[in-house]
């Protein structure tokens, strides 16, 4: 049995990133799900092409793994322009930003992942670049310091964030197109898994794809990660074909239950129940008890637990729901913090 398999791991290895890139759709036609977002982007992109100008700046926000990077690449492909990728933490100082911006060709797309992590000083420099296609930078230091203005080619900034609430109001206001990505339903994920299996030349039954989809937390990145692991089991424990039996066997071995919850999800719920009588309890306290980063819990784990009804946020903190007790086979604490059984 494989232990501590984190299907939401943010730091991908080179091999895993190559795997993801091989499965990415390159145009709107091949992109599944997010219908409203895609339909709107089709119109915005077509209008920009008709006017032969840069597309307005785009902000994509939502939980990890829903296709923000893929959509950004598709935007560039559909516009027929260059595509450059960077991230908020990488742009450490204004000179880093200036180097990227001055390398852009007219109407290119610049993708900044984790844009909420831009340093305040870099963000200030970005304002004029987004509005006026120019940037002012300081040359030298002390008495000889002077400011020079660099003219930039028109470009489209696509910013991606999993925590849109951390964006400053001035930065958010400079995005003309603001789009939120939702979790995917099982039918769409099933089609994504079958497409990925075809690309990987792995036979995969429809029911098996549906089984993987139902445990993928509404997230294509997780669906593809699970497909890769189930493929391993199919090749070693089976005939190489992914059927529903081998899919279920593999997912159980990976501790992915029928709700898509893994060992860490269940540990969060159990900690709140066992140590804090079901809550409410503060996020920082939960993080300390688990030895996890509070931001990671809030950004990576909580959204799905809340969406599926296992956890809720209250003014006094996090609290597990009746569904969580039922899922874990636990008794429920009443409001006086005494136990009772149904």
Swiss-Prot record:
Binding residues for DNA: 313, 318
Region (Small ATPAse domain (RuvB-S)): 185-255
Organism: Phocaeicola vulgatus (strain ATCC 8482 / DSM 1447 / JCM 5826 / CCUG 4940 / NBRC 14291 / NCTC 11154)
Major localization class: cytoplasm
Record-given protein name: Holliday junction branch migration complex subunit RuvB
Any one biological process term the GO annotation gives: DNA recombination
Binding-site list for Mg(2+): 69
Localization: Cytoplasm
Name of encoding gene: ruvB
Assembly behavior: Homohexamer. Forms an RuvA(8)-RuvB(12)-Holliday junction (HJ) complex. HJ DNA is sandwiched between 2 RuvA tetramers; dsDNA enters through RuvA and exits via RuvB. An RuvB hexamer assembles on each DNA strand where it exits the tetramer. Each RuvB hexamer is contacted by two RuvA subunits (via domain III) on 2 adjacent RuvB subunits; this complex drives branch migration. In the full resolvosome a probable DNA-RuvA(4)-RuvB(12)-RuvC(2) complex forms which resolves the HJ.
PANTHER family, per database record: HOLLIDAY JUNCTION BRANCH MIGRATION COMPLEX SUBUNIT RUVB, PTHR42848
Family recorded in the similarity comment: Belongs to the RuvB family.
Function as written in the Swiss-Prot or TrEMBL entry: The RuvA-RuvB-RuvC complex processes Holliday junction (HJ) DNA during genetic recombination and DNA repair, while the RuvA-RuvB complex plays an important role in the rescue of blocked DNA replication forks via replication fork reversal (RFR). RuvA specifically binds to HJ cruciform DNA, conferring on it an open structure. The RuvB hexamer acts as an ATP-dependent pump, pulling dsDNA into and through the RuvAB complex. RuvB forms 2 homohexamers on either side of HJ DNA bound by 1 or 2 RuvA tetramers; 4 subunits per hexamer contact DNA at a time.
Domain remark text: Has 3 domains, the large (RuvB-L) and small ATPase (RuvB-S) domains and the C-terminal head (RuvB-H) domain. The head domain binds DNA, while the ATPase domains jointly bind ATP, ADP or are empty depending on the state of the subunit in the translocation cycle. During a single DNA translocation step the structure of each domain remains the same, but their relative positions change.
């Amino acid at each position: 049995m494989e232990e501590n398999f984190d299907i939401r791991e943010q730091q991908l290895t080179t091999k895993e990133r190559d795997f993801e890139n091989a499965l990415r759709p390159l145009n709107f036609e091949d992109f599944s799900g997010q219908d409203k977002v895609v339909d709107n982007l089709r119109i915005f992109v077509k209008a920009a092409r008709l006017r032969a100008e840069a597309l307005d700046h785009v902000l994509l926000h939502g939980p990890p793994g829903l296709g923000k990077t893929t959509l950004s690449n598709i935007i560039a492909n559909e516009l027929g322009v260059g595509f450059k990728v960077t991230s908020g933490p990488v742009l450490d100082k204004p000179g880093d930003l200036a180097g990227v911006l001055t390398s852009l060709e007219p109407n290119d797309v610049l993708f900044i992942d984790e844009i909420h992590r831009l340093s305040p000083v870099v963000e200030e420099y970005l304002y004029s670049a987004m509005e006026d296609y120019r940037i002012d930078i300081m040359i030298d230091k002390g008495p000889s310091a002077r400011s020079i203005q660099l003219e930039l080619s028109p470009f489209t900034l696509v910013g991606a964030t999993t925590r849109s609430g951390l964006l400053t109001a001035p930065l958010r206001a400079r995005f003309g197109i603001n789009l939120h990505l939702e979790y995917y339903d099982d039918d769409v994920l099933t089609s994504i898994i079958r497409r990925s299996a075809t690309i990987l030349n792995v036979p995969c039954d429809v029911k098996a794809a549906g089984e993987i989809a139902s445990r993928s937390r509404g997230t294509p990145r997780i669906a593809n990660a699970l497909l890769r692991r189930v493929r391993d089991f199919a090749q070693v424990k089976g005939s190489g074909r992914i059927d529903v039996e081998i899919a279920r066997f593999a997912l159980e071995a990976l501790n992915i239950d029928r709700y898509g919850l893994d060992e860490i999800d269940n540990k969060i719920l159990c900690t709140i129940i066992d140590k804090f009588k079901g809550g409410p309890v503060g996020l920082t306290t939960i993080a300390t008890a688990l030895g996890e980063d509070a931001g990671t819990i809030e950004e990576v784990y909580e959204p799905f637990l809340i969406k599926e009804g296992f956890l809720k946020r209250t003014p006094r903190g996090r609290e597990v729901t009746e569904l969580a007790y039922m899922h874990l086979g636990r008794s429920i604490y009443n409001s006086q913090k005494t136990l009772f059984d149904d």
